[in-house]
């Protein structure tokens, strides 16, 4: 068990802001906060992993699927949903390599290199790929909630008429209209805030903006998913 990748983005953003604050204000006391900020996740992760390993009577928690698998998957075309979305590649490649983390990592790196070569050879295809991936993830005001509910409700026969109306009927269109409005309103307000914060050169006010833009950059390469954008929307 370890710090989730999305949480790592926020951690890195906070570290960047603290370092810039220390440089600008010559505040050496910030070093203490930096050590705590970096050390606390490591200590807690180690403690949790140790407890789980002890409970499972293992020497250590297996490494599992490498993070490179999610990057490789994020650079693959996906005709079922959209480019870079989940396609079970991470699990498939892990099983193909007999659950060997090292061998899986090598296979994922080969896949990443192949994707990069294809993008480099076909720049227009590359731009189209990332455009579709970016739009499909960040222009979803429902953050994948509606399609997820639909997926998991298709084989249930105990749903109320109200639920059916909002999942499959015209109620779905009403919800989409409401979500489109508040989604646009929040993004517009956030953009204005980010612009004003940059003009004022106030580091503390730029933390949230840095987290959001870090998320944008991170998910250009990582596996895409509408639900991943929800935490940044809250920020």
Where on the chain are the PLM-derived regions?
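Membrane-interfacial entry segments at the cytosolic side of transmembrane helices
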Residues: 24-39
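Transmembrane-embedded, aromatic-rich helix segments that form part
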Residues: 6-21, 234
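Structural signal for the C-terminal ends of transmembrane alpha-helices
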Residues: 16-26, 194-200
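Membrane-interface anchor segments at the N-terminal boundary of transmembrane helices
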Residues: 132-212
């Amino acid at each position: 068990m370890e710090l989730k990748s999305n949480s790592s983005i926020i951690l890195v953003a906070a570290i960047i802001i603290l370092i810039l604050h220390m440089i600008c204000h010559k505040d050496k006391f910030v070093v203490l906060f930096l050590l705590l900020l970096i050390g606390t996740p490591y200590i807690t992760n180690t403690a949790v992993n140790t407890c789980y390993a002890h409970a499972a009577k293992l020497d250590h928690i297996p490494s599992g699927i490498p993070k490179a698998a999610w990057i490789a998957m994020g650079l693959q075309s996906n005709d079922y949903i959209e480019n870079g979305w989940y396609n079970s590649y991470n699990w498939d490649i892990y099983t193909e390599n007999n659950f060997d983390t090292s061998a899986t990592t090598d296979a994922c790196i080969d896949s990443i290199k192949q994707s990069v070569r294809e993008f480099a050879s076909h720049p227009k295809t590359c731009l189209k790929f990332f455009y579709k991936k970016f739009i499909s993830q960040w222009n979803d005001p429902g953050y994948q909630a509606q399609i997820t509910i639909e997926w998991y409700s298709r084989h249930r026969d105990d749903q109320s008429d109200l639920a059916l109306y909002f999942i499959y009927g015209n109620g779905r269109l009403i919800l989409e209209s409401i979500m489109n409005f508040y989604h646009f309103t929040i993004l517009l307000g956030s953009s204005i805030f980010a612009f004003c914060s940059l003009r004022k050169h106030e580091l503390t006010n730029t933390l949230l903006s840095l987290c959001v833009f870090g998320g944008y950059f991170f998910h250009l390469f990582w596996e895409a998913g509408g639900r991943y954008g929800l935490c940044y929307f809250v920020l």
